[in-house]
């Protein structure tokens, strides 16, 4: 993947996630600036999602841990746990929102 493809993939992912946030039942606020998306939960906790261009990775920081995702076979996969990004976000957001949260993986 070249730099242009990488940036387009991340930009699309962030836009998809922003659009989904408007439809979730949990009260999750968000801020978006300079390719950083911050999800803000009622309890004050945050999930921060950002690009890591030199490594072509997507980084996610939760109140529990940091995660680095690599693009493999059309999916963003956590390099440590092997979990796919959207499944990870469902689990992480549900924990931090303290209610079930579901982000369906977008279709291409």
Swiss-Prot record:
Keyword Transit peptide (UniProt): no
Alphabetical list of SUPFAM superfamilies matching this protein: Frataxin/Nqo15-like
Classification via Pfam families: Frataxin_Cyay (PF01491)
Keywords: Iron, Metal-binding
MF terms in GO: ferric iron binding; ferrous iron binding
Statement: the UniProt record of this protein carries the keyword Metal-binding: yes
GO cellular component: cytosol
InterPro entries associated with the record: CyaY (IPR047584), Frataxin/CyaY (IPR002908), Frataxin/CyaY_sf (IPR036524), Frataxin_CS (IPR020895)
GO biological process: iron-sulfur cluster assembly
Matches recorded under CDD domains: Frataxin
PANTHER family in the record: FRATAXIN, FRATAXIN, MITOCHONDRIAL
HAMAP family the record matches: CyaY
Biological role: Involved in iron-sulfur (Fe-S) cluster assembly. May act as a regulator of Fe-S biogenesis.
NCBIfam families (alphabetical): FeS_CyaY
Similarity section: Belongs to the frataxin family.
UniProt name for this protein: Iron-sulfur cluster assembly protein CyaY
Taxonomic path: Bacteria, Pseudomonadati, Pseudomonadota, Gammaproteobacteria, Alteromonadales
């Amino acid at each position: 993947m070249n730099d242009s493809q990488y940036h387009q993939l991340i930009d699309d992912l962030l836009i998809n996630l922003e659009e989904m946030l408007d439809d979730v039942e949990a009260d999750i606020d968000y801020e978006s600036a300079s390719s950083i998306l911050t999800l803000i939960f009622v309890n004050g906790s945050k999930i921060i999602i950002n690009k890591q261009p030199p490594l072509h990775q997507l980084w996610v920081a939760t109140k529990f841990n940091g995660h680095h995702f690599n693009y493999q076979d059309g999916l963003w996969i956590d390099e440590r746990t092997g979990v796919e990004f959207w499944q990870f976000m469902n689990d992480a957001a549900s924990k931090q929102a303290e209610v079930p949260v579901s982000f369906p993986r977008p279709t291409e």
